[in-house]
C-alpha cells in the first residue's frame, strides 16, 4: 500500500476525534503535541483527494481546546497551588518551579490576556487552565478569553496551514524541492532559537526559586 492509499483509508471521523482528543488533553494540563496533531490534520485537509474538512478540523480543535481548558481550570480551582508543588516533584521537566513561576509571572502581568495569548505558547497552553483555576481567576472572564483564544489559535492555525499546503503544491510545480527544504529548515532553526530562549528564562526562574528557599 502506497502513502496516498494509506491516507485515503483514514476515516475523517478518526482524524477529528484525534485532533479534539489530543488538543483537549493538552489543554487540560497534560503535555501532548496538540499543535503538531492540529498542523498535521490541517495539512491533510489541504489535499482535495482526501475527505478531511479544514472547517471540521478547526471546529473540533476549538471544542477540544475550550473543553480541556475548562476542565483544567476546574481541577486547578479544586486543588489550588499545592497541585503544582506535587506535579513539580513528580514531573519536574514539565511542571518544575521555573515553569510555574514563569506562567504565574505572566498571569500577574497580563491578567486574563495570558489565557488568550497563552493559546499560542506551548508552556502557557499546558498550564493556563489549571493555573487560572488555582489563582481563582473569575470563571466568566476566563471562559471568554479561553474560547476566543481557542478560536483564533485553532482557526488561524488550520487556515494558515491549509492555504500553505495548497500553495506548497503549486510552489513545487514551479520551483524545486530545494527551495521548500530551505524554507522548512529556516523555520525549524527559528523555532529552536525561541525554545532555547524560553528554556534559559525557565532556568533563571528556577534558580531564583531555589535561592528564595535557601
From Swiss-Prot:
**Superkingdom of origin organism:** Bacteria
Q: Which InterPro entries match?
A: DedA_domain (IPR051311), VTT_dom (IPR032816)
The regions listed as transmembrane in this protein's record are 10-30, 55-75, 147-167, 174-194
Entry keywords, A to Z: Cell membrane, Membrane, Transmembrane, Transmembrane helix
How does it sit in the bilayer?
Answer: Multi-pass membrane protein
Q: Give the UniProt subcellular location, in the record's own words.
A: Cell membrane
A Pfam family of the record is: VTT_dom
One GO cellular-component annotation of the UniProt record comes to: plasma membrane
- What family name appears in the similarity comment? Belongs to the DedA family.
**What name goes with this protein?**
Uncharacterized membrane protein ML0467
Q: Which organism is it from?
A: Mycobacterium leprae (strain TN)
Q: What is the lineage of its organism?
A: Bacteria, Bacillati, Actinomycetota, Actinomycetes, Mycobacteriales
